[in-house]
Amino acid sequence: MPKRGKKAAADDGEEPKSEPETKKSKGAAKKTEKEAAGEGPVLYEDPPDQKTSPSGKSATLKICSWNVDGLRAWIKKKGLDWVKEEAPDILCLQETKCSENKLPAELQELPGLTHQYWSAPSDKEGYSGVGLLSRQCPLKVSYGIGEEEHDQEGRVIVAEFESFVLVTAYVPNAGRGLVRLEYRQRWDEAFRKFLKDLASRKPLVLCGDLNVAHEEIDLRNPKGNKKNAGFTPQERQGFGELLQAVPLADSFRHLYPNTAYAYTFWTYMMNARSKNVGWRLDYFLLSHSLLPALCDSKIRSKALGSDHCPITLYLAL
C-alpha cells in the first residue's frame, strides 16, 4: 500500500477531561524558544483529499466523526455550517451532552441526514452521549456493547449496513488523577471482545473519540504526559491490543505513518490550539478487509466549534 505524504463550562454541562501536562521537557523548551524567535508553532496542513482507492476506484462513501463537546454549544458555534459544507453520507457525533427529548431542532435541517439515532445517559443530563446520522437507512441499529456496567452512559451506537458495520464510540476518559483508569481498563477489555465478535460477521468501521494517543507521534508533549489520562501505558497497551485482537487498522497511520503534528484535540487552556499543542484522540479504525477500499483519512484541523476537530473517511465500496 503506497503511503501518503479544560475549559470554561458550556451551558449544557461538561465532562471533566485530563489536560495536557504543562511542564516542558528540554526539547520542548527549545521548540518554544524557536517559536518565540519568530519561527512560529508547527501547524498541521491537511493535504488535498484523495478520492480514489489504491486500485483506482472512486470513493462511494464519506463518513465524518466529531466530538462536539455539547450539541447546543456546537450549534451556536456554527458547527452545522461545516457539516453542510462537508456533506458526509454519515455523520457520527460524540459528547453530545443532550438527551433525545431535548435535541435542537436545527438538526432536522441537515440536508439528507434524515435517519438519526441518539444515545445518552438515562440519569445524567449534560454528560457523554453519541449520535449517528445517515443518508441511508441502516439495516439494523443497536446501542451499547451488551454489558450493563458499560451501557449506562450513552457511549456506543452500532449501525449495520449492507457491506459493513459502523460503530461510533465515546470511550471513557481515565480522568484527572486517573480516578477512572481501572474502570477504563475493564471497558477496554469488554469493548475489545464486543468488536471482535462484530468483526467476525461483517467488515467493521470504528470511529469516534477513543480517548487515547497511541504513540508518541500522536501528541505534542509525550514525555510530560505518560502519567496522564489518554497516554498511560495501560491505555496505550489496551489500544494496541484492540488493533491486534479484532483486528483493526488505524486508517490515518496506515496512509500517513510518519506525519507528525496531526492532532484532533486541544485543551481550551494556554492557547493550545493556536500553538498546535494537541493530541490525536479521534480515529477511524477499519477491518483489514476494507483497506483496499480506503481512499483517504482526513483530519480537518481548521474546523472550529469544539475542543476537538472533525475527521473524515473516504471509502470506495
Swiss-Prot record:
Q: Where is this motif: Nuclear localization signal (NLS)?
A: 8-12
Q: Where Phosphothreonine occurs, residue numbers? A: T232
Taxonomic source organism = Mus musculus
**PTMs per UniProt:** Phosphorylated. Phosphorylation by kinase PKC or casein kinase CK2 results in enhanced redox activity that stimulates binding of the FOS/JUN AP-1 complex to its cognate binding site. AP-endodeoxyribonuclease activity is not affected by CK2-mediated phosphorylation. Phosphorylation of Thr-232 by CDK5 in response to MPP(+)/MPTP (1-methyl-4-phenylpyridinium) reduces AP-endodeoxyribonuclease activity resulting in accumulation of DNA damage and contributing to neuronal death. Acetylated on Lys-6 and Lys-7. Acetylation is increased by the transcriptional coactivator EP300 acetyltransferase, genotoxic agents like H(2)O(2) and methyl methanesulfonate (MMS). Acetylation increases its binding affinity to the negative calcium response element (nCaRE) DNA promoter. The acetylated form induces a stronger binding of YBX1 to the Y-box sequence in the MDR1 promoter than the unacetylated form. Deacetylated on lysines. Lys-6 and Lys-7 are deacetylated by SIRT1.
Query: Localized where?
Result: Nucleus; Nucleus, Nucleolus; Nucleus speckle; Endoplasmic reticulum
Q: Which SUPFAM superfamilies match?
A: DNase I-like
Q: Which Pfam families match?
A: Exo_endo_phos
The residues responsible for catalysis, as annotated, are Y170, D209 (proton donor/acceptor)
Q: Which GO terms describe its cellular component?
A: centrosome; cytoplasm; endoplasmic reticulum; mitochondrion; nuclear speck; nucleolus; nucleoplasm; nucleus
Cofactor(s) the protein requires to work: Mg(2+); Mn(2+)
What does the UniProt function comment say about this protein?
Multifunctional protein that plays a central role in the cellular response to oxidative stress. The two major activities of APEX1 are DNA repair and redox regulation of transcriptional factors. Functions as an apurinic/apyrimidinic (AP) endodeoxyribonuclease in the base excision repair (BER) pathway of DNA lesions induced by oxidative and alkylating agents. Initiates repair of AP sites in DNA by catalyzing hydrolytic incision of the phosphodiester backbone immediately adjacent to the damage, generating a single-strand break with 5'-deoxyribose phosphate and 3'-hydroxyl ends.
Give the activity regulation note: NPM1 stimulates endodeoxyribonuclease activity on double-stranded DNA with AP sites, but inhibits endoribonuclease activity on single-stranded RNA containing AP sites.
This protein is called DNA repair nuclease/redox regulator APEX1
Q: What is known of its domains?
A: The N-terminus contains the redox activity while the C-terminus exerts the DNA AP-endodeoxyribonuclease activity; both function are independent in their actions. An unconventional mitochondrial targeting sequence (MTS) is harbored within the C-terminus, that appears to be masked by the N-terminal sequence containing the nuclear localization signal (NLS), that probably blocks the interaction between the MTS and Tom proteins.
* PTM annotation (Phosphoserine): residues: S18, S53
Q: In which tissues is it expressed?
A: Expressed in both resting and stimulated B cells stimulated to switch (at protein level).
Spell out the reaction equation it catalyses. Answer: a deoxyribonucleotide-2'-deoxyribose-5'-monophosphate-DNA + H2O = a 5'-end 2'-deoxyribose-5'-monophosphate-DNA + a 3'-end 2'-deoxyribonucleotide-DNA + H(+); Exonucleolytic cleavage in the 3'- to 5'-direction to yield nucleoside 5'-phosphates; a 3'-end 2'-deoxyribonucleotide-3'-phosphoglycolate-DNA + H2O = 2-phosphoglycolate + a 3'-end 2'-deoxyribonucleotide-DNA + H(+); a 3'-end 2'-deoxyribonucleotide-8-oxoguanine-DNA + H2O = 8-oxo-dGMP + a 3'-end 2'-deoxyribonucleotide-DNA + H(+)
Sequence segments annotated as region (Disordered): 1-58
Subunit structure as annotated in this protein's UniProt entry = Monomer. Homodimer; disulfide-linked. Component of the SET complex, composed of at least APEX1, SET, ANP32A, HMGB2, NME1 and TREX1. Associates with the dimer XRCC5/XRCC6 in a DNA-dependent manner. Interacts with SIRT1; the interaction is increased in the context of genotoxic stress. Interacts with HDAC1, HDAC2 and HDAC3; the interactions are not dependent on the APEX1 acetylation status. Interacts with XRCC1; the interaction is induced by SIRT1 and increased with the APEX1 acetylated form.
A GO term, aspect molecular function: DNA-(apurinic or apyrimidinic site) endonuclease activity
Primary site of residence: nucleus
Does Cell wall biogenesis/degradation show up as a keyword for this record? Answer: no
Its keywords, alphabetically, are:
Acetylation, Activator, Cleavage on pair of basic residues, Cytoplasm, Disulfide bond, DNA damage, DNA recombination, DNA repair, DNA-binding, Endonuclease, Endoplasmic reticulum, Exonuclease, Hydrolase, Magnesium, Metal-binding, Mitochondrion, Nuclease, Nucleus, Phosphoprotein, Repressor, RNA-binding, S-nitrosylation, Transcription, Transcription regulation, Ubl conjugation
Q: Where is this region: Necessary for interaction with YBX1, binding to RNA, association together with NPM1 to rRNA, endoribonuclease activity on abasic RNA and localization in the nucleoli?
A: 2-32
